[in-house]
Amino acid sequence: MSWSFLTRLLEEIHNHSTFVGKIWLSVLIVFRIVLTAVGGESIYYDEQSKFVCNTEQPGCENVCYDAFAPLSHVRFWVFQIILVATPSVMYLGYAIHKIARMVEHSDVDRRFRSKSFSTRWKQHRGLEEAEDDHEEDPMMYPEIELESERENKEQQPPAKAKHDGRRRIREDGLMRIYVLQLLVRATFEVGFLIGQYLLYGFEVSPVFVCSRKPCPHKIDCFISRPTEKTIFLLIMYGVSCMCLLLNVWEMLHLGFGTIRDTLNNKRKELEDSGTYNYPFTWNTPSAPPGYNIAVKPDQMQYTELSNAKMAYKQNKANIAQEQQYGSNEENIPADLENLQREIKVAQERLDMAIQAYNNQNNPGSSSREKKSKAGSNKSSASSKSGDGKNSVWI
């Protein structure tokens, strides 16, 4: 296993823990991994070769060394580091798997919402029902999303989620597994402290008295650098105790922090209960930004002229709406061509309606002129027949 893999692994553990867990990780790296790899190699490299006994009995030194150190100090500490770090590694794997699933579900929900908002709306038939030409007049214009912007959004990788504290761990549903790995880690620390005391005690003696077979009698064996090894042994005791205290501190931090958050939430709920809350929320469906919809008024007398005028006004409103919301988009020329074509059709309809309206009004005016001429002739005739008589005006 290379150091780069171990470094990446510890970095991921650092990103998925509380600040107390980050302190524990720093102690693990500096005072355990580095100290064991550097100091242990230089101190214990000649441990067995420098173990000398005052006898020449074959096999006696090996038996006495086995009695002095059933397990080498360095191997014991390496085994301790592996077992203590195992719960954190297992928690890391679980956290990465769960966060990846959460990110995947959030991406699916986001895509579903974007598809629901980008659906193509059908043309409004409010004015079509009153017309007799059986032609559809579009009353809604969707805000078209650029393909380049959509591709850029799809190409952007999702942001990497990191846990920076206790609240984030609780929000993602990792609190139970995090507390469980703390308990297992603390149990391992206590077990290794007891085992280290039973195997080595608190001091490395310079002389070890051995009476095992095949030694003929009690012999004295001498250990190299006993004082240096004693100091190193005490340092490792201190590091183990420090890691155990950090585990206890982190569990207390999680417990008291959770209690404090619960009390704060209850206090906020009590404060919010005093304010008036509406019994329902207004969840009426609405069109996305950029859409314009015309509502058919009730009991409105539709004529050909009114239809043409309303279509002309609606097209002008659509132009203003598209200029307001779509000024920064690249697909404006295509939309303007469609709008200009529709405006041209609406203007032609308006001219035809005005012409038809004028033609309908001209026969009425001519009949009125004829009637007025007939009335004038009758009045002139009556005036001629009644010459010499006084007319009385009332």
UniProtKB/Swiss-Prot annotation:
<dbReference type="GO" id="GO:0007267">
    <property type="term" value="P:cell-cell signaling"/>
</dbReference>
<dbReference type="GO" id="GO:0045202">
    <property type="term" value="C:synapse"/>
</dbReference>
<dbReference type="GO" id="GO:0016264">
    <property type="term" value="P:gap junction assembly"/>
</dbReference>
<feature type="topological domain" description="Extracellular">
    <location>
        <begin position="200"/>
        <end position="229"/>
    </location>
</feature>
<feature type="topological domain" description="Cytoplasmic">
    <location>
        <begin position="96"/>
        <end position="176"/>
    </location>
</feature>
<comment type="function">
    <text>One gap junction consists of a cluster of closely packed pairs of transmembrane channels, the connexons, through which materials of low MW diffuse from one cell to a neighboring cell.</text>
</comment>
<feature type="transmembrane region" description="Helical">
    <location>
        <begin position="177"/>
        <end position="199"/>
    </location>
</feature>
<keyword id="KW-1133">Transmembrane helix</keyword>
<feature type="topological domain" description="Extracellular">
    <location>
        <begin position="46"/>
        <end position="75"/>
    </location>
</feature>
<feature type="transmembrane region" description="Helical">
    <location>
        <begin position="230"/>
        <end position="252"/>
    </location>
</feature>
<keyword id="KW-0303">Gap junction</keyword>
<feature type="transmembrane region" description="Helical">
    <location>
        <begin position="76"/>
        <end position="95"/>
    </location>
</feature>
<keyword id="KW-1003">Cell membrane</keyword>
<dbReference type="GO" id="GO:0005654">
    <property type="term" value="C:nucleoplasm"/>
</dbReference>
<dbReference type="GO" id="GO:0048738">
    <property type="term" value="P:cardiac muscle tissue development"/>
</dbReference>
<dbReference type="InterPro" id="IPR002265">
    <property type="entry name" value="Connexin45"/>
</dbReference>
<keyword id="KW-0965">Cell junction</keyword>
<feature type="topological domain" description="Cytoplasmic">
    <location>
        <begin position="253"/>
        <end position="394"/>
    </location>
</feature>
<dbReference type="GO" id="GO:0005922">
    <property type="term" value="C:connexin complex"/>
</dbReference>
<dbReference type="Pfam" id="PF00029">
    <property type="entry name" value="Connexin"/>
</dbReference>
<protein>
    <recommendedName>
        <fullName>Gap junction gamma-1 protein</fullName>
    </recommendedName>
</protein>
<dbReference type="InterPro" id="IPR017990">
    <property type="entry name" value="Connexin_CS"/>
</dbReference>
<dbReference type="InterPro" id="IPR038359">
    <property type="entry name" value="Connexin_N_sf"/>
</dbReference>
<dbReference type="GO" id="GO:0005216">
    <property type="term" value="F:monoatomic ion channel activity"/>
</dbReference>
<comment type="subunit">
    <text>A connexon is composed of a hexamer of connexins.</text>
</comment>
<dbReference type="InterPro" id="IPR000500">
    <property type="entry name" value="Connexin"/>
</dbReference>
<dbReference type="InterPro" id="IPR019570">
    <property type="entry name" value="Connexin_CCC"/>
</dbReference>
<feature type="topological domain" description="Cytoplasmic">
    <location>
        <begin position="1"/>
        <end position="22"/>
    </location>
</feature>
<dbReference type="GO" id="GO:0086077">
    <property type="term" value="F:gap junction channel activity involved in AV node cell-bundle of His cell electrical coupling"/>
</dbReference>
<comment type="similarity">
    <text>Belongs to the connexin family. Gamma-type subfamily.</text>
</comment>
<dbReference type="GO" id="GO:0048468">
    <property type="term" value="P:cell development"/>
</dbReference>
<dbReference type="GO" id="GO:0007601">
    <property type="term" value="P:visual perception"/>
</dbReference>
<dbReference type="GO" id="GO:0005243">
    <property type="term" value="F:gap junction channel activity"/>
</dbReference>
<dbReference type="InterPro" id="IPR013092">
    <property type="entry name" value="Connexin_N"/>
</dbReference>
<dbReference type="GO" id="GO:0001570">
    <property type="term" value="P:vasculogenesis"/>
</dbReference>
<dbReference type="GO" id="GO:0005783">
    <property type="term" value="C:endoplasmic reticulum"/>
</dbReference>
<dbReference type="GO" id="GO:0007268">
    <property type="term" value="P:chemical synaptic transmission"/>
</dbReference>
<feature type="transmembrane region" description="Helical">
    <location>
        <begin position="23"/>
        <end position="45"/>
    </location>
</feature>
<feature type="compositionally biased region" description="Polar residues">
    <location>
        <begin position="356"/>
        <end position="366"/>
    </location>
</feature>
<feature type="compositionally biased region" description="Low complexity">
    <location>
        <begin position="374"/>
        <end position="394"/>
    </location>
</feature>
<keyword id="KW-0812">Transmembrane</keyword>
<keyword id="KW-0472">Membrane</keyword>
